[in-house]
């Protein structure tokens, strides 16, 4: 019985990335647009099955979402396919709370619903 995918701290993630690990954001598009960890690639959880081939199986991958649920699912799915997949502890929220850099400069980590509302207001997303 598994306890879930390995979890890495922010410091461990920074070290892994410096050593060549891939950083993948599995949040939705509107969350990605609000702010993301510098250097991350975007692969929403909903598209993981179709796009997993975009991830290099020969390098570790650190996945993150807002707080950990989606990155847990993504890491478990990738690990089942033979990837060295880990999830970032506390997600992008923990990253931002520590004052670590986000893109674009001044990016934010709003609540999921709040992010969508802000983007609707800014007319970046069509109204639903």
What is each model feature region?
Residues 1-22, 28-60, 69-128:
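Rhodanese-like catalytic fold shared by cysteine-dependent sulfurtransferases
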Residues 63-65:
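Short, surface-exposed ligand- or partner-binding patches at beta-edge/loop junctions that are enriched
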């Amino acid at each position: 019985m598994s306890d879930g995918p390995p979890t890495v701290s922010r410091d461990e993630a920074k070290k892994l990335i410096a050593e060549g690990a891939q950083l993948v954001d599995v949040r939705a598009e509107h969350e990605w647009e609000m702010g993301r960890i510098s250097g991350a690639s975007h692969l929403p959880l909903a598209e993981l099955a179709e796009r997993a081939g975009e991830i290099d199986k020969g390098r570790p991958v650190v996945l993150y979402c807002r707080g950990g649920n989606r990155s847990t699912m993504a890491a478990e799915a990738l690990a089942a396919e033979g990837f060295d997949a880990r999830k970032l502890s506390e997600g992008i929220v923990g990253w931002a709370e520590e004052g670590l850099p986000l893109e674009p400069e001044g990016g934010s980590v709003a609540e999921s619903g709040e992010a969508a509302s802000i983007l609707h207001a800014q007319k970046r997303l069509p109204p639903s």
